[in-house]
Amino acid sequence: MAEQVFQNFETLQLHAGYTPDPHTRSTAVPIYATSSYTFNDSAHGARLFGLKELGNIYSRLMNPTVDVFEKRIAALEGGIAAAATSSGQAAQFLTIATLAKAGDNIVASSHLYGGTYNQLNVLLPRFGIKTKFVRSGKLEDYAAAIDDQTRAIYVESMSNPDYVVPDFEGIAKIAHEHGIPLVVDNTLGAGGYYIRPIEHGADIVVHSATKWIGGHGTTIGGVIVDSGRFNWNKHSERFPEMVEPSPSYHGLKYWEAFGPATFITRIRVEMLRDIGACLSPFSAQQLLLGIETLGLRAERHAQNTEKLAKYFESSPNVSWVLWPGSESHPTYAQAKKYLTRGFGAMLSIGVKGDASAGSKVVDGLKLVSNLANVGDAKSLAIHPWSTTHEQLSEDERLASGVTEDMIRISVGIEHVDDIIADFEQSFQKAYGS
């Protein structure tokens, strides 16, 4: 009888990527707190360093605890492999640095997290990599922005903080017609619970694992997932590093040696080796603990967010509500199509009053924390105009969907009545009603 293969999300989050430790039979994933690994002999070490054999060399490249985390996320997202990084920003940077070099560009939605926008708009140009931002979201505008030097299209599965859900299938089709991969930041997709972009044409998925994957605000981390579906050999003119002899490994040809895993292999053996933005085993263990309850948390997050959105829609102190599950949201049709397990765990509101009204409401909250994170089990709120997007110009903030009256809310798993009551009392202090 064939071995049963368990593929449901809630099962994978507990079991994928791990069998009991062979030395101790530990049912929990051990923390391998080591910098390096003993070789069987010199020949074994030489084979590992030459990539003729895969195995542990140094924890900057790989670590057994981190390996379980990588395999589990790859399973949850439907990819062939993953590489963990020190943060979500690191995951993003290493991905683009693997795809592009000086003189190249990427095409990206302008609806992005402020830190992402800064990395694309300010940091990467210092390395000679430019970004063409598409503000409209129209497929024809993505197509028009692509030229011979374009190396990827980059979007967020739900943009932060205005929750634009892109037309993944349409954008993927355009990317593939031009011989470039689609990269999706699926941080707000909660580790693949709300959406698995690979199922809709994405080639590479990145996450800030700090958020819903970890889920408790304890650990900074990132991860890159490779779908294994992009044919680098077919598009070798744009991506010669994927197929031509590598000077790092005595002429090794990645595509010839690793095939569909070419991209993620280069991330590991070049980018993690040279940049060093690796995840520690201690952080990996914390993130693995978070993953074990991811489905349960994500379900409650989505339920609470929907109830809170409906409360805000009826509040006299709120002028507008941005939530992808609302029929009034500009990309509601796409959200309904792609977000099949809930409309996420975030929303934004515009509060009535002058420019200081948003800050007053946030400052008046007692239960909901005012801080620069999302995806915590606890509810969080922030005024993006003066914090997360403060470093952008006014025009850039507006292009990113940030307005002066906006409050961004990451809805936690507390009882929703208590979350609502906290906003009620803050509104009372700010407006007297």
From Swiss-Prot:
Modified residues (N6-(pyridoxal phosphate)lysine): K211
Metabolic or biological pathway, per its Swiss-Prot or TrEMBL entry: Mycotoxin biosynthesis
Record-annotated membrane-spanning stretches: none
CDD domains in the record: CGS_like
A GO CC term assigned to this protein in UniProt: cytoplasm
One Pfam family recorded for the sequence: Cys_Met_Meta_PP
Enzyme class: transferase
UniProt keyword list: Pyridoxal phosphate, Transferase
Signal peptide: none
Biological process per Gene Ontology, one example term: cysteine biosynthetic process from serine
The keyword Cytoplasm is annotated on this UniProt entry: no
Named cofactor requirement(s): pyridoxal 5'-phosphate
InterPro entries assigned to the protein according to its UniProt record, in alphabetical order: Cys/Met-Metab_PyrdxlP-dep_enz, Cys_met_metab_PP, OAc-hSer/O-AcSer_sulfhydrylase, PyrdxlP-dep_Trfase, PyrdxlP-dep_Trfase_major, PyrdxlP-dep_Trfase_small
Gene Ontology MF annotations: cysteine synthase activity; O-acetylhomoserine aminocarboxypropyltransferase activity; pyridoxal phosphate binding
The keyword Amino-acid biosynthesis is annotated on this UniProt entry: no
Entry-linked SUPFAM superfamilies: PLP-dependent transferases
Known uses: Fusaric acid is phytotoxic to plants such as cotton and banana. It has been shown to induce programmed cell death in plants. In addition to a mild toxicity to animals, fusaric acid exhibits acanthamoebicidal, antioomycete, and antimycobacterial activities.
PROSITE patterns: CYS_MET_METAB_PP
E.C. numbers: 2.5.1.-
Job description of the protein: Sulfhydrylase; part of the gene cluster that mediates the biosynthesis of fusaric acid, a mycotoxin with low to moderate toxicity to animals and humans, but with high phytotoxic properties. L-aspartate is suggested as fusaric acid amino acid precursor that is activated and further processed to O-acetyl-L-homoserine by cluster enzymes aspartate kinase FUB3 and homoserine O-acetyltransferase FUB5, as well as enzymes of the primary metabolism.
Similarity comment text for this entry: Belongs to the trans-sulfuration enzymes family.
Protein name from the UniProt record: Sulfhydrylase FUB7
Organism: Fusarium oxysporum f. sp. lycopersici (strain 4287 / CBS 123668 / FGSC 9935 / NRRL 34936)
Organism classification: Eukaryota, Fungi, Dikarya, Ascomycota, Pezizomycotina
Gene encoding the protein: FUB7
